[in-house]
Every structure is written in C-alpha cells, then in structure tokens.
Amino acid sequence: MENIIQKIREIYPVSDEALQALQANMELRYYPKDTYIVQSGVTDRLVYFIEEGIARSVFHHNGQDTTTWFTLEGDITFGMDSLYYQQPSVESIETLSDCKIYVIHIDKLNMLYETYLDIANWGRILHQNVNKEL
C-alpha cells in the first residue's frame, strides 16, 4: 500500500494507527486491463484505492464514450451517485492497465471516519480538492 499511503499523507497527516485500521478493512483485488470495475446503471458501494495501474471514469451517451476523469496510482475512485445517493452510477470506471486495487465498502469507511478524526479530515480535504478541480 505504499503508493496509497504516500498519497493519503500528501493530503493529510494520518496516523499509523488509523492507516492500519484502514488497511485492515480493505480487500486487495487484481483487475486486468479493460475491466469495468464500476458499471453505469449499477449501484456500487465500494471505494477503490489504486495501488498500481490507471483507470478512467467514462460517460456513455448516444454511442459515444467521454472520459471525465483519470485515476492514477495512489488515487481513489468510485461511482459518485452510488456512493453518495445509493443510486445506479451514471458513469463507468474502466481499467486502462492491469491494476492492483484495494477496495473498502463505504459503510466500513464511514465507520473509520467516525472512529479516527484524522481519517475523517483526510476524507474531507480529499473531497474539497476534487470539487475544486471540477
């Protein structure tokens, strides 16, 4: 989880204890290139931490694919509508290379937000930064 931890700590100084709790609640998965880890029209309640590889968020409309976001090593990605509103995702997330990804269910991440102030602050600042980039 070296890339993920480095990126987390670039955003906020999360303690070793909190990072250990985060890692204990994650599952390691491997996805081959060209895999849709989130599919439009499907509700997905997972947060994906990219340790190795690259993925893109893509919006499908009228037979056209529009890339809206790239997720690099150390970054997180998720279906926004699914995660925030428990509705089917309007975008898909596709791996552009073979990927090593840690996943965590949003309920577990919310539990960590409630337990560890530094994880909650990291999440808040992360979302502020993403919204600023939009």
Language model regions located:
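Cytosolic regulatory regions built on CNB/CRP/Popeye-like sensor folds
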Residues: 1-134
